[in-house]
Amino acid sequence: MIFVGGIFMNVKAIMCDIDGTLLSSEGVVTPKTVEMIKKAREKGILLGLSTGRDVNSIQTLLKIWGIDGLVDMIVGTGGAEIYDYTSDLAKAQYPLDGRLIKSIIKHYEDMDCNFAIPEDGILFAPKDDEYIQMLAKADKVPYQVVDYNELLQNPKPKLIIICKPEDMDKIIERSKTFHSDEFKSSSLKTASVLYEYMDPRVSKTAGLIEILKLHHIDLKEIVTFGDADNDYDMTLNAGIGVVMAKW
């Protein structure tokens, strides 16, 4: 039980964003954070990660971050994937059609940017440049340059646009003119250099609802921590939503 806003709240789970939240500016989980995670779990509070990264890439990094064995559940790819350690259940939903992804890329083809599709712990890009190298290094995830015509014969979880921070406003402005008569999509800025497209049914809240059902936990019984636009919905819908400030 914790005391917030004049009432006691029975917290059953903590769901934490990774980049800019769980990880320090050096890209690690600090010993103090690990200690607090252990104390929470000793009280029966579950720990989950809710992130734009794909589940597979997160799982490969848990040991490096020093939290292997401390995570109970993962909401990945912005809510399109879930993995529950207790039941060993994995689920993916609402991918983007390959034809839609191609049309999005065409919409931005004259701009200074690159693209990435995260899948199976790998970032797949249509070309090799400083942008995909930067993202792969920052996320500690390998990347491969592939033929998107072949890759996009099947639906994919989401599309990431990578750009310079100073070009993000141009990317956002260009997004306002994208339209597809055949497919629906939503998009948002997820970092200073990342802009993402996904199915409009995908959100961290939707992923949380799906995975919390397995533990009979309501959204109002969790605390969330996040720092970016894709954390906004879970911050609003959680029992307590904590917004991380950048100093």
Language model: regions and residue ranges:
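Hydrophobic/aromatic beta-strand patches that form the interior of the parallel beta-sheet core
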Residues: 48, 75, 223-225, 242
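Non-catalytic pre-domain segments flanking phosphatase-related domains
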Residues: 1-18, 35-38, 42
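Short, acidic loop-to-helix structural element flanking the phosphoryl-transfer center
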Residues: 27-43, 93-102, 199-213, 220-221, ...
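Active-site phosphate-binding/coordination module
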Residues: 31-131
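Residue-level detector of anion-binding/catalytic polar loops
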Residues: 46, 114, 218, 240-241
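Asp-based phosphoryl-transfer active-site loop
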Residues: 10-27, 235
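Short, well-ordered alpha-helix to beta-strand connector turns
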Residues: 11, 71, 156-157, 238
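Conserved acidic, metal-coordinating active-site core of Asp-based
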Residues: 107, 111-234, 246
